[in-house]
Amino acid sequence: MARASGASDYRSGELSHQDERGAAHMVDITEKATTKRTAVAAGILRTSAQVVALISTGGLPKGDALATARVAGIMAAKRTSDLIPLCHQLALTGVDVDFTVGQLDIEITATVRSTDRTGVEMEALTAVSVAALTLYDMIKAVDPGALIDDIRVLHKEGGRRGTWTRR
């Protein structure tokens, strides 16, 4: 398990999305301060060198995979509260989805920003997940064995707990 700076600040032993009876509920954020929030998440699509070359040159039958995945990730971040039952609707002020192309993989990184009462980690994770799923959809005809892997939050800042970074 990866360690993170400030990890002890997060280990209160209580799950915020359960009430005293253990039932799921949406956290009431009415009294929380509105602050600038940022989260960065990443994930990896593992495939073959041939598929990475097709993606890099735009040679896939379905078209420009990276451009399509970027737009899909941005759209997904904006729809997170529709997909994750207990997430709040947030007014996102920025979403960036970027790709680092390796020899056998593509790393997907999403950065999400907002000025709101709750964090944007779920929006960043959703952006990465849907961008990765979109890439898979676009390459599955040439590599059905491609693997989506290692989706995680890398960094968050803002709110009562301040900054957290995965080490």
From Swiss-Prot:
Residues 1-23 are annotated as: Disordered. It comes from the Bacteria. The keyword Transport does not apply. The active site is at D137. This is Cyclic pyranopterin monophosphate synthase 2. Catalyzes the conversion of (8S)-3',8-cyclo-7,8-dihydroguanosine 5'-triphosphate to cyclic pyranopterin monophosphate (cPMP). The gene is moaC2. Pathway: Cofactor biosynthesis; molybdopterin biosynthesis.
